[in-house]
């Protein structure tokens, strides 16, 4: 076993996964996590891999690229996906988790590994020696300054937003119904139907509600996948009806008709006592937020246990700075992982940590770092963040559009996606022992 130690900075999804992958390969890890010594504006605990936005890791089927990346990670012994599978809650065709159990499970698996030493302290300078920086969207100011100096480039700022969570007991169950869209999977969502009149009243209140002011020096650049509901509404009333309040496939069993609009609630904990409001990430002040949410049928007396909040997100210009191994181009033993690389989403962040961790371990053992082919979901993400146009670089979720093209064109989308998935999983099996 090598005597060299790899520093991993940040015990979020990417950092926890990276530390585990390094440790299981017989390499010592120093895992630095500043919480609880210093908290961030969005975290509430000292647990690893705390989910600060939704509790859903999105689609769990192979007809979706994020489902494929999960299956690749299962084959590669991902600690994040293992913990998620063990802490899952009902969510139709998605993989959602009890966020508290999930974070506790990841913490247990990583912290208890004999090759992992946890250091609860803030890192303000980039260490010498093999290092993975996985400090995420809320990198502390001191380390951010160091990274700016290192890269010679400014960061890009945007906001991720978290949706409110309500107590199930406070929901008027006479006004809502249990159903998944198009009846896919088990009936996993509580649906709050709206008439056009109810929607109009809600919409007018939403666009008039007061938001928390942004700081002058921060530019508003929202990632489309986690955009505040009031920002979507400001683009026009139909944006909501065709977005998070889309009613298609959600016929009301009481009337047999499709409502004008629907607000969906998704189970947030294993006990089924908490529900989050799907797609309702928001930056509204808490008073106006409560008033607006209580205009939703069934939520008139809702007890809000967590208000929607927003936090800054930060990412580097990876096409200029990184290789598809997640190595920094100017320093072979420095790696980046997680959302700061421009991969967007919980699963994608963990996947980047998995690959960065494997490559950091290989580096200190004198082995060549691995580049996963872009026919795989993980390889396509690494390829996207390092080979796309640097000038217009934006965060991206896993999607089949990033995969290398199929050899033969397939017209039907379902068959095409199945072909992408089959090829990806056949390929990734060649890498399970790296």
Curated annotation (Swiss-Prot):
NCBIfam families: gid_trmFO (TIGR00137), PRK05335.1 (NF003739)
Catalysed reaction equations from the record: uridine(54) in tRNA + (6R)-5,10-methylene-5,6,7,8-tetrahydrofolate + NADH + H(+) = 5-methyluridine(54) in tRNA + (6S)-5,6,7,8-tetrahydrofolate + NAD(+); uridine(54) in tRNA + (6R)-5,10-methylene-5,6,7,8-tetrahydrofolate + NADPH + H(+) = 5-methyluridine(54) in tRNA + (6S)-5,6,7,8-tetrahydrofolate + NADP(+)
Entry's Gene Ontology BP terms: tRNA methylation; tRNA wobble uridine modification
GO molecular function ontology, one term from the record: flavin adenine dinucleotide binding
Subcellular location field: Cytoplasm
UniProt name for this protein: Methylenetetrahydrofolate--tRNA-(uracil-5-)-methyltransferase TrmFO
PANTHER family given in the database record: GLUCOSE INHIBITED DIVISION PROTEIN A, METHYLENETETRAHYDROFOLATE--TRNA-(URACIL-5-)-METHYLTRANSFERASE TRMFO
Cofactor field: FAD
């Amino acid at each position: 076993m090598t005597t060299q130690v790899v520093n991993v900075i940040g015990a979020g999804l990417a950092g926890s996964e990276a530390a585990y992958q390094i440790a299981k390969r017989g390499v010592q890890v120093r895992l630095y996590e500043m919480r609880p010594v210093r908290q961030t504006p969005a975290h509430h605990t000292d647990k690893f891999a705390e989910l600060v936005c939704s509790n859903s890791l999105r689609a769990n089927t192979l007809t979706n690229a994020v489902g494929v990346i999960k299956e690749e990670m299962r084959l590669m012994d991902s600690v994040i996906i293992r913990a998620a599978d063990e802490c899952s809650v009902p969510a139709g065709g998605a993989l959602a988790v009890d966020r508290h159990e999930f974070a506790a499970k990841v913490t247990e698996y990583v912290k208890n590994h004999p090759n992992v030493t946890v250091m609860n302290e803030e890192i303000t300078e980039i260490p010498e020696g093999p290092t993975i920086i996985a400090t995420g969207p809320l990198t502390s100011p001191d380390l951010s300054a160091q990274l700016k100096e290192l890269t010679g480039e400014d960061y890009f700022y945007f906001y991720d937003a978290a949706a409110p969570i309500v107590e199930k007991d406070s929901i008027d169950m006479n006004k809502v119904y249990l159903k998944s869209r198009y009846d896919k999977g088990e009936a996993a969502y509580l649906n709050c139907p709206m008439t056009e009149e109810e929607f109009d009243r809600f919409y007018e209140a939403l666009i008039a509600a007061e938001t928390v002011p942004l700081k002058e020096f921060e530019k508003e650049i929202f990632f489309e996948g986690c955009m505040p509901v009031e920002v979507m509404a400001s683009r026009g009333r139909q944006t909501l009806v065709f977005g998070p309040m889309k009613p298609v496939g959600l016929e009301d069993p009481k009337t047999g008709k499709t409502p004008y609009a629907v607000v969906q609630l998704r189970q947030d904990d294993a006990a089924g006592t908490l529900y989050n409001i799907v797609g309702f990430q928001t930056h509204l002040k808490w008073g106006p937020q409560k008033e607006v949410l209580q205009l939703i049928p069934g939520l008139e007396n809702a007890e809000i246990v967590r208000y929607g909040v927003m936090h800054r997100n930060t990412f580097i210009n990876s096409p200029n700075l990184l290789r598809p191994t997640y190595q920094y181009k100017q320093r072979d033993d420095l790696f980046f992982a997680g959302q700061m690389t421009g991969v967007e989403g919980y699963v994608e962040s963990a996947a980047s940590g998995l690959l960065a961790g494997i490559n950091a371990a290989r580096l200190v053992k004198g082995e060549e770092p691995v580049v996963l082919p872009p026919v795989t979901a993980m390889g396509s993400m690494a390829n996207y963040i390092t080979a796309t146009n640097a000038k217009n670089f934006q965060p991206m979720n896993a999607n089949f559009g990033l995969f290398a093209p199929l050899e033969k064109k397939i017209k039907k989308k379902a068959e095409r996606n199945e072909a992408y998935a089959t090829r990806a999983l056949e390929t990734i099996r060649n890498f399970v022992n790296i």
